[in-house]
Amino acid sequence: MEHGGDIYGNKNIDLDFSVNLSPIGPPREVTGAILDGELQGLLTRYPDPMYRELRRALSRKPELPEEWILCGNGASELLMAVVQAVRPKRAMIPVPSYQGYERVLEAVGAGILFYELKREQGFALTEDFLESADGLKRLADGLKTEEPRAAQSGAMLFLCNPNNPVGKCIEPELLNKIAEYCRENHIFLVVDECYMDLVPDARHKSMRRALAENPYLIIVDAFTKTYAMPGIRLGYMMLSSADLRRAVQMQQPEWSVSMFAQRAGLAALGSEGYLHEARQAVRAEREYVCERLREMGMEVFDGEAPFVMFFSRKELYGPLKEKGILIRRCDGIRGVRGSSEEGGHYYRIGLRSHEENIRLMRMIEELLDQ
């Protein structure tokens, strides 16, 4: 499966815009924690397998019971673990979306239903998803069960909020309706909020407030995107169902969160003012990049995330790569694989510093002028 950030297979890359991270880089506190001499002295110890200190700190962030939080070696591990725990007969993914959901569902042999988001609606999830015959109702048909036990559920729904690669958040009112529908129809709802902390008004748009009333709701998040630390694999999952938590933990290896990851996570959570600064940077740089791309005649899709998706009839990936700049061409993502009729491609660029974003825009402009 293709991901952004494959700098190891692409030599001589100077600027990597193919990954979606906080544009201001990791917090100073994280760098300090990793370089701390005290941590080097802990190399001979096993990490806390229950990551108690980290879980306690995480519970204060969304104000949840500590026991509702599970941590893992990145969000990817947790997505695989929850799918292996539930083993759904079938699942639904609105597309375009993150490709990793398909991978974990294929691993357990689940039948995957795809709901195509419409380009003319900016690839936004709308009320049609609830009302149309090919939407959520198609997943619920004949799959009702009695209890929210992992082994008894036949269905899962995956939503990425804000959505990757588009960058758009689901309207909170619609998301609440979807969550309630899933609860009533015994469908496990996985909401991927790995970019949520970087969007404006994140608290209002997050589904964490609904966990207490919905045992079928599962929220996944990660330090990777929010704190720009993908090299330290650290993700977490929030869910209120005790049965499902036990089932997920049975799928995880022991000590899945290293000592380095636990210390880095604690340092990130303790970085005062970081999220406010990161959100301001995302808003400003997104506005700048979208404006410049539109001035060049690109079709740019609205969103709030730290990345921008656009459509270009001009080939950009190869020429930019030759200049040492890596962007994401979305040809491998279901729903945005380009258009043979138009002869173009969808691209996604992660936001970086203002100076780096200026450099990318100038490079694209030069290519268009050729």
Indicate where each model-derived feature is located.
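Conserved PLP-anchoring active-site segment centered on the Schiff-base-forming lysine
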Residues: 85-106, 111
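PLP-dependent enzyme catalytic core of the Aspartate aminotransferase-like
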Residues: 173, 333-370
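Helix C-cap/helix->beta junction micro-motif
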Residues: 108, 184-185, 214, 296
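Active-site phosphate-binding strand-loop segment of PLP-dependent enzymes
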Residues: 119-199
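PLP-dependent aminotransferase class I/II
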Residues: 25-27, 100, 216-301
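N-terminal "arm"/small-domain region of PLP-dependent enzymes with the aminotransferase-like
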Residues: 1-45, 141
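Conserved PLP-binding catalytic core of the aspartate aminotransferase-like
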Residues: 295-324
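Short loop-beta-helix segment that forms the pyridoxal 5′-phosphate
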Residues: 59-81, 94
